[in-house]
Amino acid sequence: MEMQASRQLAVTQQQAWDALNDPEVLKVCIPGCDKVEATGENQYAIGMALKIGPVSAKFKGNIELSDIQAPASYKLSFEGQGGPAGHGKGSAAVVLTPNAAGCELGYTVQASVGGKIAQLGQRLIDGAAKAMAEDFFKRFDLEMQKQHPASYAARDAAAAAAGAEAPAESGGGGVPIWAWGVGAVVLAAVIWLSR
Protein backbone atom coordinates (compact mmCIF):
# COMPACT_ATOMS: atom_id res chain seq x y z
CA MET A 1 0.00 0.00 0.00
CA GLU A 2 1.22 3.50 -0.77
CA MET A 3 -0.26 6.79 0.38
CA GLN A 4 0.74 10.35 -0.37
CA ALA A 5 -0.87 13.60 0.75
CA SER A 6 -0.26 17.01 2.24
CA ARG A 7 -1.93 19.18 4.81
CA GLN A 8 -1.81 22.93 5.45
CA LEU A 9 -1.08 23.84 9.08
CA ALA A 10 -1.55 27.30 10.63
CA VAL A 11 1.60 26.93 12.76
CA THR A 12 5.21 27.59 11.82
CA GLN A 13 7.49 24.90 10.50
CA GLN A 14 9.36 24.78 13.84
CA GLN A 15 6.13 24.54 15.87
CA ALA A 16 4.90 21.66 13.70
CA TRP A 17 8.31 19.95 13.92
CA ASP A 18 8.36 20.22 17.70
CA ALA A 19 4.85 18.78 18.00
CA LEU A 20 5.53 15.92 15.60
CA ASN A 21 8.53 14.96 17.72
CA ASP A 22 6.74 15.19 21.07
CA PRO A 23 5.63 11.74 22.30
CA GLU A 24 2.88 13.24 24.48
CA VAL A 25 1.36 15.19 21.56
CA LEU A 26 1.49 12.09 19.37
CA LYS A 27 -0.13 9.94 22.05
CA VAL A 28 -3.05 12.39 22.20
CA CYS A 29 -3.37 12.64 18.42
CA ILE A 30 -2.95 9.04 17.21
CA PRO A 31 -6.30 7.22 17.41
CA GLY A 32 -6.20 4.33 19.89
CA CYS A 33 -2.66 5.11 21.04
CA ASP A 34 -1.80 4.46 24.68
CA LYS A 35 2.00 4.47 24.54
CA VAL A 36 4.71 6.44 22.77
CA GLU A 37 8.07 6.32 24.48
CA ALA A 38 11.67 6.85 23.48
CA THR A 39 13.77 3.67 23.55
CA GLY A 40 16.97 5.19 22.17
CA GLU A 41 18.19 8.02 20.02
CA ASN A 42 15.52 8.54 17.34
CA GLN A 43 13.85 5.24 18.31
CA TYR A 44 10.41 4.81 19.84
CA ALA A 45 8.07 2.10 21.08
CA ILE A 46 4.35 2.50 20.50
CA GLY A 47 1.23 0.74 21.72
CA MET A 48 -2.25 1.10 20.34
CA ALA A 49 -5.59 -0.61 20.00
CA LEU A 50 -7.48 -0.64 16.75
CA LYS A 51 -10.41 -2.18 15.02
CA ILE A 52 -10.66 -2.71 11.30
CA GLY A 53 -13.86 -4.35 10.21
CA PRO A 54 -14.28 -7.46 12.36
CA VAL A 55 -10.63 -7.50 13.50
CA SER A 56 -9.74 -5.87 16.83
CA ALA A 57 -6.33 -6.08 18.41
CA LYS A 58 -3.73 -4.45 20.61
CA PHE A 59 -0.60 -3.64 18.64
CA LYS A 60 2.97 -3.04 19.74
CA GLY A 61 5.63 -1.67 17.47
CA ASN A 62 8.78 0.29 16.91
CA ILE A 63 9.65 3.36 14.89
CA GLU A 64 13.08 4.63 13.94
CA LEU A 65 13.77 8.09 12.49
CA SER A 66 16.55 8.66 9.95
CA ASP A 67 17.74 11.25 7.41
CA ILE A 68 16.73 13.94 9.90
CA GLN A 69 16.92 17.49 8.50
CA ALA A 70 15.39 19.49 11.37
CA PRO A 71 12.97 21.26 11.12
CA ALA A 72 12.26 20.35 7.49
CA SER A 73 12.12 16.58 7.01
CA TYR A 74 12.90 13.03 8.09
CA LYS A 75 12.25 9.45 7.15
CA LEU A 76 10.87 6.85 9.46
CA SER A 77 10.79 3.08 9.40
CA PHE A 78 8.21 1.15 11.36
CA GLU A 79 7.18 -2.36 12.21
CA GLY A 80 4.50 -3.70 14.47
CA GLN A 81 2.87 -6.89 15.75
CA GLY A 82 -0.73 -7.51 16.72
CA GLY A 83 -0.58 -11.23 17.42
CA PRO A 84 -2.93 -13.29 15.26
CA ALA A 85 -4.62 -10.08 14.06
CA GLY A 86 -1.59 -9.31 11.96
CA HIS A 87 1.60 -7.43 11.50
CA GLY A 88 2.94 -4.65 9.36
CA LYS A 89 6.03 -2.78 8.33
CA GLY A 90 6.91 0.11 6.14
CA SER A 91 8.45 3.54 5.82
CA ALA A 92 7.39 7.14 5.50
CA ALA A 93 8.98 10.38 4.33
CA VAL A 94 7.74 13.54 6.05
CA VAL A 95 8.40 17.08 4.79
CA LEU A 96 7.44 20.39 6.42
CA THR A 97 7.52 23.33 4.00
CA PRO A 98 7.12 26.87 5.37
CA ASN A 99 4.68 29.19 3.59
CA ALA A 100 2.81 32.44 4.22
CA ALA A 101 -0.06 30.63 5.98
CA GLY A 102 2.19 28.59 8.31
CA CYS A 103 3.56 25.40 6.84
CA GLU A 104 2.54 22.46 4.70
CA LEU A 105 3.05 18.94 5.97
CA GLY A 106 3.62 16.48 3.14
CA TYR A 107 4.13 12.76 3.45
CA THR A 108 4.56 9.59 1.45
CA VAL A 109 4.07 6.19 3.07
CA GLN A 110 4.73 2.68 1.88
CA ALA A 111 3.39 -0.14 4.05
CA SER A 112 2.63 -3.83 3.93
CA VAL A 113 0.44 -5.87 6.27
CA GLY A 114 -0.05 -9.56 6.95
CA GLY A 115 -2.25 -11.83 9.06
CA LYS A 116 -6.00 -11.41 9.56
CA ILE A 117 -5.81 -7.71 8.70
CA ALA A 118 -4.42 -8.50 5.25
CA GLN A 119 -7.31 -10.90 4.65
CA LEU A 120 -9.81 -8.05 5.02
CA GLY A 121 -9.00 -6.74 1.58
CA GLN A 122 -7.15 -3.72 0.30
CA ARG A 123 -10.24 -1.53 -0.07
CA LEU A 124 -11.23 -1.91 3.59
CA ILE A 125 -7.63 -1.43 4.76
CA ASP A 126 -7.12 1.67 2.61
CA GLY A 127 -10.41 3.17 3.79
CA ALA A 128 -9.56 2.54 7.44
CA ALA A 129 -6.06 4.01 7.00
CA LYS A 130 -7.47 7.16 5.40
CA ALA A 131 -10.07 7.52 8.15
CA MET A 132 -7.36 7.15 10.82
CA ALA A 133 -5.18 9.72 9.09
CA GLU A 134 -8.09 12.18 8.93
CA ASP A 135 -8.81 11.59 12.62
CA PHE A 136 -5.13 12.12 13.44
CA PHE A 137 -5.05 15.46 11.61
CA LYS A 138 -8.23 16.69 13.25
CA ARG A 139 -6.74 15.87 16.65
CA PHE A 140 -3.38 17.36 15.69
CA ASP A 141 -5.04 20.56 14.47
CA LEU A 142 -7.00 20.85 17.74
CA GLU A 143 -3.82 20.29 19.75
CA MET A 144 -2.00 22.97 17.74
CA GLN A 145 -4.91 25.37 18.33
CA LYS A 146 -4.56 24.74 22.09
CA GLN A 147 -0.79 25.22 22.05
CA HIS A 148 -0.64 28.12 19.55
CA PRO A 149 -3.95 30.02 19.67
CA ALA A 150 -2.38 33.20 18.25
CA SER A 151 -1.38 31.41 15.03
CA TYR A 152 -4.95 30.28 14.45
CA ALA A 153 -6.41 33.65 15.41
CA ALA A 154 -4.11 35.34 12.87
CA ARG A 155 -5.12 32.84 10.18
CA ASP A 156 -8.82 33.37 10.89
CA ALA A 157 -8.42 37.16 10.95
CA ALA A 158 -6.59 37.12 7.62
CA ALA A 159 -9.30 34.94 6.10
CA ALA A 160 -12.03 37.24 7.43
CA ALA A 161 -10.22 40.31 6.08
CA ALA A 162 -10.00 38.65 2.69
CA GLY A 163 -13.71 37.91 2.84
CA ALA A 164 -13.12 34.20 2.57
CA GLU A 165 -13.26 31.23 4.86
CA ALA A 166 -10.14 29.82 6.50
CA PRO A 167 -8.04 27.80 4.06
CA ALA A 168 -9.26 24.28 3.54
CA GLU A 169 -6.92 21.45 4.33
CA SER A 170 -5.56 19.63 1.35
CA GLY A 171 -5.30 15.96 0.68
CA GLY A 172 -6.03 13.21 3.09
CA GLY A 173 -4.56 9.85 3.34
CA GLY A 174 -3.31 7.72 5.90
CA VAL A 175 -0.61 6.67 7.97
CA PRO A 176 -0.31 5.30 11.14
CA ILE A 177 2.87 6.42 12.37
CA TRP A 178 2.80 7.55 16.01
CA ALA A 179 5.62 9.45 14.95
CA TRP A 180 6.24 12.61 13.30
CA GLY A 181 5.11 13.89 10.25
CA VAL A 182 2.20 13.30 11.33
CA GLY A 183 3.40 12.53 10.76
CA ALA A 184 1.57 12.73 11.33
CA VAL A 185 -1.02 11.79 8.91
CA VAL A 186 0.92 9.02 7.51
CA LEU A 187 2.11 7.90 10.81
CA ALA A 188 -1.24 7.31 12.32
CA ALA A 189 -2.36 5.21 9.41
CA VAL A 190 0.94 3.41 9.14
CA ILE A 191 0.94 2.59 12.80
CA TRP A 192 -2.59 1.41 12.54
CA LEU A 193 -1.71 -0.85 9.63
CA SER A 194 1.58 -1.98 11.08
CA ARG A 195 0.19 -3.07 14.42
Feature map (PLM): residue ranges:
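Short, surface-exposed coil-to-beta transition loops
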Residues: 4, 58-62, 87-92
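Residues located in well-ordered beta-strands
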Residues: 32, 62-64, 95
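Beta-strand/loop substructures that line and gate deep hydrophobic ligand-binding cavities in soluble
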Residues: 67, 79-127
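Charge-rich (especially acidic), low-complexity segments
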Residues: 146-195
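Hydrophobic pocket/interface hotspot
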Residues: 16-20, 26, 65, 107, ...
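Hydrophobic ligand-binding cavity/cleft-lining segments
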Residues: 1-45, 51, 180-195
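Glycine-rich portal/gate segments that line the openings of hydrophobic small-molecule binding cavities
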Residues: 38-79
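A conserved amphipathic terminal alpha-helix motif
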Residues: 116-155
